[in-house]
Amino acid sequence: MIRFERVTKGPVRNLSFDLDRGATAKILFDSEDRKNLLFGLLAGLQRPEAGRILFFGEDLFAHEEDERLALFRRVGVVPAHGGLISNLKAWENLLLPAWYHRGLTAEQAERPVAEIFDHLGPSEAGLKRRMGELPGQLSLYERRVVALARAMLMEPDILIYDFTFAGLERDAAQQLMKLTGKFHGRKAGRVSLYLCPDDAVSARLAADSTITLAH
């Protein structure tokens, strides 16, 4: 599903890994700059200097941009800071991709979103009340939850988590770890790739494989 073949870009040198259907993996970083570089490669925003990046068996950069975008409709991304549109309310941010790409209405999204929030325990009620706020009025945790729910509504085959648990209190990080684990198991063959700082919080994240990128 995701394959790197001796990929080189800046400080990332000769990186190779292969994630098959159903895999979970975490990549640990010693610097956010290195993480941002790899995220750009995974998102198709940066072209490698050498090597190949394949999604679903297709070389990303052997395709024109339109074809590459079609591949990424099967890929979800949860940006570290939420990646929310500043002048749209949280609920509007959450719904926009599912409405645009899947034709999902607010009424149709209500049940799956409620199921996602149900896994968040005591914070669920407060989060629901906050869905009418703009992103700038939300906490980091709340922005991450909105970004998670937005990606999950698309039911992607691959989901890439960008420092999703970094900077959160232990209990909040643990809640999101449980949520992503449950979501991974909901669809046969789904791949979950976590980009993580090399710290104690990330050490608690269960994954089939771990890759460490450090100097």
List PLM regions with ranges.
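Helix-to-loop junction immediately C-terminal to a conserved catalytic motif
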Residues: 43
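Conserved ABC transporter NBD signature motif
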Residues: 51-59
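ABC ATPase NBD coupling module
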Residues: 60-76
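Conserved catalytic motifs of ABC-family nucleotide-binding domains
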Residues: 81-92, 100-104
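ABC-type ATPase nucleotide-binding domains, specifically the catalytic core motifs of the NBD
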Residues: 95-108, 118-121
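Hydrophobic anchor residue at the start of the ABC signature
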Residues: 147-148
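Conserved catalytic loops of ABC-family nucleotide-binding domains
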Residues: 171, 176-198
